[in-house]
């Protein structure tokens, strides 16, 4: 009896250890497949296996265990992936980890429930659930696109062209499916061998053994698995062929030349001396770029490159040093032939409301809107949760003060998807991580934009992995909508991206630099299929998986009730 108990305990310990190995392996695959501290570009092909150990973990775990494993997976995966958040504020990383602790606990629970109610081909339902989860996690106030599987393929230039048809979440089907396919193949083969061995070892009549063997073969049939695998292979091949066929095709015969400036400045430095030094550095880098080319049509400065509000300090400011700095800047712009796109902390003053501050892009053109400053303005719409926007500041005032991190207030939210039209180029200016959101950039293109000029500041992260993660997502906005992108960042990554998502030119990280590139002027009438239809692939995965779950649950309840 004692020996039996020891064997049970030993078996249980081995089982837990194996589950922990599967859990850690899942998190490590997720981490390594994305840009990370070891591999700056990520190991993209690992993403095709990301969910394989996770599905085995779900299969081998009890319901109570899945909740715990899901929580640990969420914390471990996003702590490894987003470690750079700690540089901004430790609270930022803690909030993300807590968020994914809850989200992944729910995900694992739903995946386990799918395994229970759909035992024969639960892998297909689980595949849809995972695709739906990766779409749903990008929505709402807490929604972020960081960690979506398909973004790992950002260097796979031919494969990602399929996004012009179905978007990032269509590519997600292709990337996630191999994990589900291999899980089905391995688990069904193992289960078949187990059942057949059990039948052979049991003392049954030949007829009974035959019936049981047939049932075992039926329950573990791989027919559907191979059919789905063949369909995936056909889709994968077709996507590559499509990608090869569209590469190099151009929808434009006209170009403009854009200089994107990278000033490599820390966002934490404040004070008029620091502001003046930074503006002078930006002017110097601009002059250096223009000395190399007299054909520059646009000059782009990064997010909040000019910290003092240009319009407010010119019209209402009482600080003479700030006024003189703004006047110096405006004089430089007015004497310049290029259109300037400048990141600015834009302030307005409303009656009975005081001053409000926006994270904005201001567009100036010499002789038209410089003196007095009346630039075109776009104010950031999607603010970073908890760091730029916290809607519960009156409910949780202590947490709000901690999140301010030494600042005195957060940004106000913009409300207009502005499209600028200068020198024949219609463009929009998604700010910071706005170019990671499919819906924002698609809305801009539907409004008439034919180029994204992104203003960012990832220098605070002090992490190349963070900057590459951001760049990886920006690449897809060009592919999805068939328009070029220009990114001007304080650091990470300043570059020019063509409509196929190919990075034409890029500046090295963490240094003062600039990139000069020719950008095609896309025709007004041109829209990709994705631009016209949106994230149908993501909505379909979420809706279909929810519908099947509900139907299967009802069927299980009915069957149990009848018994």
Region spans (language model):
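Soluble catalytic regions of membrane-associated enzymes that act on cell-envelope
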Residues: 242-385, 420-423, 429, 433-435
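C-terminal luminal/periplasmic domains and tails of membrane-associated envelope-modifying transferases
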Residues: 294-295, 389, 484
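Short, conserved active-site loops that position catalytic residues or coordinate cofactors/metal ions
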Residues: 38-53, 262-263, 295-315, 449, ...
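Membrane-embedded alpha-helical bundles of multi-pass enzymes
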Residues: 2-246, 463, 474, 489, ...
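CN hydrolase (nitrilase-like) catalytic-core segments centered on the catalytic cysteine
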Residues: 127-128, 306, 318-340, 395, ...
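Short beta-strand scaffold segments in enzyme catalytic cores
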Residues: 359-363, 418, 492-497, 515-517
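Short, solvent-exposed loop/turn segments at secondary-structure junctions
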Residues: 87, 308-309, 349-350, 460-463
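Active-site catalytic loop in hydrolytic enzyme cores
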Residues: 85-91, 136-168, 354-438
């Amino acid at each position: 009896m004692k020996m039996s108990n020891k064997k049970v305990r030993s078996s249980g310990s081995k089982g837990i250890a194996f589950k922990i190995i599967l859990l850690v392996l899942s998190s490590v695959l997720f981490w390594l497949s994305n840009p990370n501290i070891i591999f700056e570009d990520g190991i993209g092909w690992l993403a095709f296996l990301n969910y394989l150990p996770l599905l085995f973990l779900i299969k081998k775990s009890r319901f109570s265990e899945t909740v715990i494993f899901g929580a640990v997976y969420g914390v471990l995966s996003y702590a490894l992936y987003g470690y750079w958040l700690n540089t901004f504020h430790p609270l930022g990383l803690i909030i993300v980890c807590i968020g994914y602790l809850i989200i992944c606990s729910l995900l694992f629970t739903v995946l386990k429930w799918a395994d229970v109610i759909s035992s024969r081909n639960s892998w297909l339902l689980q595949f849809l659930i995972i695709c739906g989860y990766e779409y749903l996690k990008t929505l709402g106030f807490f929604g972020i696109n960081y960690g979506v599987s398909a973004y790992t393929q950002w260097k796979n230039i031919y494969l990602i062209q399929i996004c012009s048809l179905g978007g990032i979440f269509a590519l997600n089907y292709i990337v996630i499916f191999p994990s589900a396919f291999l899980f089905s193949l391995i688990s069904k083969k193992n289960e078949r061998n187990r059942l057949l061995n059990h039948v052979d070892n049991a003392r049954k009549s030949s007829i009974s053994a035959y019936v049981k063997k047939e049932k075992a073969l039926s329950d573990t049939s791989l027919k559907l698995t191979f059919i789905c695998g063949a369909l995936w292979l056909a889709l994968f091949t077709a996507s590559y062929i499509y990608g090869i066929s569209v590469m190099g095709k151009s929808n434009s015969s006209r170009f403009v030349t854009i200089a994107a400036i990278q000033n490599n400045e820390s966002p934490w430095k404040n004070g008029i001396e620091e502001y003046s030094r930074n503006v002078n550095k930006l002017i110097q880098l601009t002059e250096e770029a223009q000395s190399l080319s007299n054909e520059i049509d646009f000059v782009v400065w990064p997010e909040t490159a000019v910290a003092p509000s240009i319009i407010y300090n010119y019209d209402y400011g009482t600080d003479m040093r700030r006024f003189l700095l703004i006047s110096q800047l405006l004089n430089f712009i007015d004497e310049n032939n290029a259109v300037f796109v400048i990141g600015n902390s834009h302030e307005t003053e409303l009656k009975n409301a005081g001053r409000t501050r926006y994270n904005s892009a201001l567009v100036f053109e010499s002789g038209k809107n410089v003196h007095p400053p009346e630039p075109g303005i776009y104010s950031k719409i999607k603010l970073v949760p908890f760091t730029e926007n916290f809607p519960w500041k009156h409910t949780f005032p202590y947490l709000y003060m901690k999140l301010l991190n030494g600042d005195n207030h957060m940004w106000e939210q913009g409300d207009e998807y502005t499209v600028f039209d200068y020198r024949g180029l219609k463009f929009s200016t998604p700010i910071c991580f706005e170019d990671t959101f499919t819906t924002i950039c698609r809305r801009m293109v539907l409004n008439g934009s034919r180029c994204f000029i992104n203003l960012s500041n990832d220098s605070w992260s002090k992490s190349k992995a963070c900057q590459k993660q951001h760049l990886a997502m920006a690449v897809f906005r060009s592919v999805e909508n068939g328009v070029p992108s220009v990114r001007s960042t304080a650091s990470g990554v300043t570059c020019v991206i063509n409509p196929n998502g190919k990075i034409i030119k890029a500046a090295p990280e963490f240094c003062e630099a600039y990139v000069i590139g020719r950008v095609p002027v896309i025709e007004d009438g041109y829209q990709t299929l994705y631009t016209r239809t949106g994230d149908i692939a993501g909505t379909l995965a979420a809706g279909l998986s929810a519908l099947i779950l509900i139907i299967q649950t009802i069927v299980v309840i009915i069957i149990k009730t009848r018994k």
